[in-house]
Amino acid sequence: MWFPRIDPAVPILAKPSPNETDLPSIATQSHNEPFHMTAGLAARLDRISTHDRYLIVPMDHGITMGAVKGLVDIESTIDGVTRGGADAVLTQKGIAPRVHPNKNDAGYIVHVNASTTIGPDENDKRVTATAEEAVRAGADAVSFHINVGSDHEPEQIEELAELTDDASRLGLPVLAMAYARGPGVDSTDPEALGHAVRLAEEVGADVVKTGYSGDGDTFTRVTESTRLPVVIAGGSKGTDRETAEMVRGAMDGGAAGVSMGRSIFQHDDPEGIARTVSAIIHDDADVDAALQAGGFSDA
């Protein structure tokens, strides 16, 4: 039997002096530092990252695509990616009992909305859990998917705003998966991606995931649009070298890491490819060194 970790009580702080009640100046904050921070929020962000770098492996695809490769025996996959260096794994709430015995020291994120590939509109994500339900499932954070530019953008903005409010009361971090998607929207356009990540910050998220613009130079325009840590989506599975090159380019463009699903959990060696990605994110390795770290002959 597993038991959710309980935070130590937050100490009662002395009443601040008048000048300490002023809000911090944006000009004095470092890039990619969350504006609001409590002890509980900071502790939970530490559980899903390492030194403010993120290797998150989302495995919520079962609700979207069914029991695809890598998710049938999700316990083994979770064990492999966490041994490979994943900072956190992510699932829907119903998978929580299968996660906790297998995630080693990794953090756990519960995703709280979904759609399916066989439904009428995959962009129409519906709420599947609340922040409180996520806490009961043992989550260290919650995540929410919003398609900026889609027909469903208005209600998704409202739902994300409600989630950030509820989560903030619990000291629970929110990862906003903010994609540029919709009629006439280029999902790799740095301006559209920059708009998406800024929206996430404006609505109160703590970390934001978005698509990759294709190279580090253009991705810099995305990361400079927000003070939140920006992590990139992995997209469909490529070669090992393509995956490593994408991660290296994103990090060079100011990313704080990745939230990479199929490229890791559907790999023939999830532990090895996780080690490759981790080497770039956490050790600042180049592509060849990262491939060697994962044990791949492509190096």
Short names for language-model regions:
Residues 2-7, 11-110:
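Conserved N-terminal beta1-alpha1 strand-loop-helix module at the mouth
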Residues 251, 266-298:
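C-terminal helical cap(s) of enzyme catalytic domains, especially alpha/beta-barrels
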Residues 232-234, 260:
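Thr-Gly-centered strand-to-loop micro-motif
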Residues 54-58, 62-89, 96-98, 107-116, ...:
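Alpha/beta enzyme core
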Residues 50, 168-169, 290:
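Short helix-terminating capping/connector loops at secondary-structure junctions
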Residues 258-265:
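Short acidic/histidine-rich active-site segments
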Residues 49, 82-85, 226, 278-285:
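Structural signal for hydrophobic packing residues in well-ordered secondary-structure cores
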Residues 237:
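A C-terminal functional module that forms or caps the active site or interfaces directly
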